């Protein structure tokens, strides 16, 4: 019996060693080919614009020609827009492989709010996705066309109270940050506006610039790049933003719209991706986000950075899940 135990012990030890060596090999070799990142919004929008910047240094090499971040492999952005992100995220969860070569950009509160409001319609939630790292936090801003009669939030609110349901506001989709900001504004100001969802921030911006809607909520970074063609009335955050220092927060105007709609952006993998692969990504991706060239390019584009580690994002996701579940009980309108 003792000889059998000895054989089993040696076999187990050999198996454990083999597993350890395999894990080490994965960490040493991954990635061996380009990585794709799905962006669930259209080309030219804030998420697409920023995703291309924060991943542009993926294949960077040092002066000696050694890979700095992801083994010298590039990241390729794949746009799959539609339904405020639902099309891209649903396809990612249903079709991608959990191997670390197919990743996706996340938007919070968007995907979390949608998983709460549409649990049967969407396939994604915080349980079947794995955060890697966060690169930015983009507040929602209330915008109107340069030719609009509204020069302030007070003008906007006064008109809305005198004309219930007449103001149309565009946004990037249902239960994305823009929609949440719109619902908060209606409740806090005691007004009724009509929210017009679109396929993403680019289309929502076009609605405002083209006069199809009277105003809209959009990303601060998108508004910043179009600031010569817009009036930016207020920012839905707790503090003014350094890129638009003259734009007040709703809070300072006496309207209780907080930072619930701030758009956190980052990269995620599928649940089930091997731990060694997750570890490589969790180590290298935040460093890539913090690259000096990335930071400079993001600042040039008026894109607020907020780099967070995997552990920090895991905590943020759980907190937002709990918070949004409560918030949407009060804000949700019947669809």
Where are these regions (language model features)?
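Solvent-exposed alpha-helix faces
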Residues: 56, 97, 160-161, 213, ...
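Surface-exposed aromatic
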Residues: 297-316
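Hinge/capping helix and adjacent helix->loop/strand transition within the periplasmic-binding protein
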Residues: 30, 68, 91-102, 112-203, ...
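C-terminal lobe and pocket-closing loops
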Residues: 137, 221-290, 319-322, 334-335
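N-terminal secretory signal peptides that target proteins for export/translocation
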Residues: 1-8
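Bacterial N-terminal signal peptides
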Residues: 11-23
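N-terminal (or domain-start) structured segment
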Residues: 28-127, 166, 174, 187-217, ...
